[in-house]
């Protein structure tokens, strides 16, 4: 996107194809800007499994052919937002398969806290 046009509200955006240089005008009533879509997961230990794009795998994304992730030490499946390391949970844009945005991240965070308490209650 190279330009937002309108008077008292957004009416149109100009989009540029970075490969061809072509610019097109698209009618619009709103613009959602997603900045920094690269997940910041480099600080995590290597045992936390990530996708090729760096998104953290959790829950069912870790299951392969109905089996728990390799090295999973517990006698239960991973919780929905639990990573390949028991007790480490991922929420928001860093999680593989998430719907990017504040509302989704907030919901993930709330659910992760609940799952963390569930994890702690097992001790």
Enumerate the language-model features and the residues they cover.
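Short, proline-enriched alpha-helix->beta-strand connector loops that line the catalytic pocket
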Residues: 28-29, 84-86
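A Rossmann-like FAD-binding core segment of flavoenzymes
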Residues: 1-75, 118-122
């Amino acid at each position: 996107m190279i330009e937002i046009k309108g008077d008292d509200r957004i009416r149109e955006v100009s989009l540029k194809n970075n490969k061809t240089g072509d610019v097109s005008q698209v009618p619009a009533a709103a613009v959602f800007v997603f900045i920094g879509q690269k997940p910041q997961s480099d600080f995590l230990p290597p045992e936390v499994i990530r996708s090729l794009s760096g998104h953290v795998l959790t829950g069912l994304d870790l299951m392969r052919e109905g089996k728990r992730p390799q090295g999973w030490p517990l006698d239960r499946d991973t919780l929905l937002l639990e990573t390949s390391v028991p007790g480490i949970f991922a929420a928001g844009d860093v999680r593989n398969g998430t719907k990017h945005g504040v509302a989704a991240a907030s919901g993930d965070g709330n659910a992760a806290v609940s799952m963390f308490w569930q994890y702690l209650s097992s001790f």
